[in-house]
Amino acid sequence: MKSIIYQQLAEKKKQGQKSFAVLIDPDKVDAGVLDELVELSIAAKVDYLLVGGSLVISNHLDDCVRHIKKSCDIPVILFPGSPSQISKYADALLYLSLISGRNPELLIGQHVVSAPFVRQSGLEIMPTGYVVVDGGAPTTVSYISNATPVPADKNEIAMCTAMAGEMLGMKLIYMDAGSGAKRPISESMIKSVADHIEVPLIIGGGIVHPEKAYLNCKAGADVIVVGNAIEKDASLIREMSDAVHSVPVLKGLDVS
């Protein structure tokens, strides 16, 4: 299987380079909005475009991905809410396993059903341990998954969950407070997790200020994902990207 994007993510982590990803929900954008998001992402040097959502109820996924690929060279990574959210036109797929919940369907059940189709897609598959954290309000992902999120103040639960995911073979850990969360994941929780895993750490949900994106990276996040805030104000793309990319690169330096 291909591993181009994952190798890039792993190398960036090794070097201490932070990445910024814009999350695009196909249900919430038309061609005009999509063009604007892509144009702003190119100008802001966005690293990745994530496409998907907890509920994609339209059949626009393929059209959305093809439109993006035609317009730019930014890698497109699928962020599926269900096995049906697959487009062969993307570059890679976050193959999400909800390791923070106790719903067997989202841990492995749906993957058994989707595996043949995922393999046939030709996409780069990135096994991802998905950890939902309480963002202070009910979210679509928590409702759909019927799973209790990790309490916002229980850093040790998040840490042990991420460690277990890594030891089970997950190549990425994605911690998410959910779209439109009132309370983003704390820096202390991010640091607790980042200090105990070696795979790249993705953080999303409730990030509305560039300063928070910066602080998350300083705490140990490798990739910052923002979607809801950008849907409301697309001009935030540059500010968020600049904040993430301004984090000093400290690892991988020869200090001898």
Where do the language-model regions lie?
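Short N-terminal or domain-adjacent regulatory/targeting segments
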Residues: M1-E11, D30-D35
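Alpha/beta enzyme core
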Residues: Q15, S19, P26-I203, V208-V249, ...
